[in-house]
Amino acid sequence: MSIKLAVKKAIYNYDSAEKLEDAKIIGGNPNGIISYNQCPQAWAYPLYKNMEDRTWFPRQINISKDKVNYSKLPEEIKQGYDLVLSQLITNDSIQTNQLMDSINQYVTSPVVNACLSHQALEEARHAESYAVMAEDICQDTNRIYELYKHDEELFLKNKAVADMYNILYQGATPTEKDILLAFVANQVLEELVFPGGFVFFYSIEQYMPGSSAMIKEINGDETLSHVPLFQNIFNTAIKETFNGIIPEEVVEKAHRMIGHMCEAEIKWTTYVTKGILGFSEHTIKVFIESQANSVCKNLKLPLLYPVVELKDNPLRKLMLDHLKGGEVESKTMFFEENATEYAKGNLDMNVDLGSVNWDD
């Protein structure tokens, strides 16, 4: 079987004969013009509007109590705070760059390009949020940004994330299967790598309420926009380019990627909590493996780990309690309502937009 190389789109392709309504996720030949009303990926514009509606700004979050309480934190919790903050800064810095420098070059549907551009903006905003926390709360800002140079576990965790994304750089030109794996990597970062750090901040909310509130907004962006975005990008690309069948090679490599990052995340989350927050290694393992299974489920891959009951898992409960209600719930309703509105037009909304099952 011949290897099909991925097509890098032109900025403006005036020779294109491709109709706007024929745009594909990968392998297309677009002219580069964004037409929201003629996009064949019916989920793309509603997701874009959802991202717009979720706009928020880091300086709106009150962190005054955190400034006072940071110096009073037990040393173990303060160390965990610094480590997790440093790691999240790296995640979103990498994500901001790779979305525009790598992924978006090979996505050939203009409206989906717009969604990815909006996500990159949100990732940059998340990095700004962490900067606010590092500069206004922590005692040594430069130390936070350079902590990976001094902590081996943090260095290894950051390297694992970077290595996962290097799939696009293994050859001079990536193949279409490489692009699929890059989509998987994005889903892994959003759904598997971030949650451990998020629940750490939720667990110290009574001491650091502003930090927890900031993370809640970031978590809402990831859960309500970024996870369904790459879920739909991957599944649509499989349908459009691979006749609805995920290539076995992609399944095998995706499983290795997910499994490797799951192990790295369990090790990292165990390291930064050190049992100080009442999280046992078993509790962490079950939670992270369930997140890995969620990645598989959303991408229609076979599950990697046994399905377990999560109702009483404290990490899962922490995350869902903070995503339920308030702004995040209202944004979910907005998204559902707008999806219905778009369905009244010519868009086929009978697609899986991605959602959070609050009762799992």
Locations of the language-model features?
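Non-heme di-metal
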Residues: S2-D360
